[in-house]
C-alpha cells in the first residue's frame, strides 16, 4: 500500500544500553552524537548476519555491527558528548538521485520524562531495543523538516533559503514511550521489534495494552545537504522495499 509517490519512510532503530538509569528516569536531557560509521548491518533485524541489510548510518556506540550484543556495547566507546552513553542508533542511508551518499553531520537524541506528570517514568531495562518510524508514522511521529518547520512526508524539501542554523535537511523520529510488563518485568523486545511498545497521549497517558510509562525519545538527524528537492533525495531503504519510484516507500 503506497501512500505517496514521493513518500520517504525514515526508520530509526535503537539498541539502548542504559546509563545511570535511576538518575535519569525523571529528567530531561539531550545527547549529541556524531556520525560513527556506515554498514549493511542491522543487529536487531538481522543479528549475526553481516551484510544482510540495506546500508545504514550508525551513530553513538562505535562498535555497532551485526554481532553487537549488550555486553559488547558496554565495553565499547561512543562518539556522543555524554559520558557513559553507549546506546546505538541507526537509520537507512540517505542518497541523492545521482546515487551519491549524503553523509549525516550529527544526531541529537532528546530524552524526557513520560507523558503524565506525577506518574513514574520507568528507566529502560538492560538490553532494551525498538524500531520506530515507517509508513504508518510518517507525518505524525516521523518525517522531514528544516529544523523547526512542520514535518514533511518527503525528504525532497528545500532548506537553503532559511535563516542561519536552519538550512540543513533533518530527519525526525519520535519513539514510542509506553511499554508492556510480563512476569513483573518490562518487556525488552518483540518478534517485530515494535509491538512491545506503543505511543501514548499527553491527555490520557499510556494505553491499557502498554501501561508502563518509559522515557520519551525524539531523534533528529541533521544531514549535510540543504536542498534535497534539487538533489532528488531518497533513502536507500526506498529502493529495497518495492517502491515503484525513488522516494516512494512501502512498509516492510
Please place each PLM-identified region on the residue numbering.
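Bacterial N-terminal signal peptides that target proteins for export
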Residues: 1-9
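C-terminal segment of classical bacterial N-terminal signal peptides
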Residues: 14-22
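Primary mode marks residue(s) on the alpha4-beta5-alpha5 output face of response regulator receiver
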Residues: 26-53, 57-173, 180-252
Amino acid at each position: 500500500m503506497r501512500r505517496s509517490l514521493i513518500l520517504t519512510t525514515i526508520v530509526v532503530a535503537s539498541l539502548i544500553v542504559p546509563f545511570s538509569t535511576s538518575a535519569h528516569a525523571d529528567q530531561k536531557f539531550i545527547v549529541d552524537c556524531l556520525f560513527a560509521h556506515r554498514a549493511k548491518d542491522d543487529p536487531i533485524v538481522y543479528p549475526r548476519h553481516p551484510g544482510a541489510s540495506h546500508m545504514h548510518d550508525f551513530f553513538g556506540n562505535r562498535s555497532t555491527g551485526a554481532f553487537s550484543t549488550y555486553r559488547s556495547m558496554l565495553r565499547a566507546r561512543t562518539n556522543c558528548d555524554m559520558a557513559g552513553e553507549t546506546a546505538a542508533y541507526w537509520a537507512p542511508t540517505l542518497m541523492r538521485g545521482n546515487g551519491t551518499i549524503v553523509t549525516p553531520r550529527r544526531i541529537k537524541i532528546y530524552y524526557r520524562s513520560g507523558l503524565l506528570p506525577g506518574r513514574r517514568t520507568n528507566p529502560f531495562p538492560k538490553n532494551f531495543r525498538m524500531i520506530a518510524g515507517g509508513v504508518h508514522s510518517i507525518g505524525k511521529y516521523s518525517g522531514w523538516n528544516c529544523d523547526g518547520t512542520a514535518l514533511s512526508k518527503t525528504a525532497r524539501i528545500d532548506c537553503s533559503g532559511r535563516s542561519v542554523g536552519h538550512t540543513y535537511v533533518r530527519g525526525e523520529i519520535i519513539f514510542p514511550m509506553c511499554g508492556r510488563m510480563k512476569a513483573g518485568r518490562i518487556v525488552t523486545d518483540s518478534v517485530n521489534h515494535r509491538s512491545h511498545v506503543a505511543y501514548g497521549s499527553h491527555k490520557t497517558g499510556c494505553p491499557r495494552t502498554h501501561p508502563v510509562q518509559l522515557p520519551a525519545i525524539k531523534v533528529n538527524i541533521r544531514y549535510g545537504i540543504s536542498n534535497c528537492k534539487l538533489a532528488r533525495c531518497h533513502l536507500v531503504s526506498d529502493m529495497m522495499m518495492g517502491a515503484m519510484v525513488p522516494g516512494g516507500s512501502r512498509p516492510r
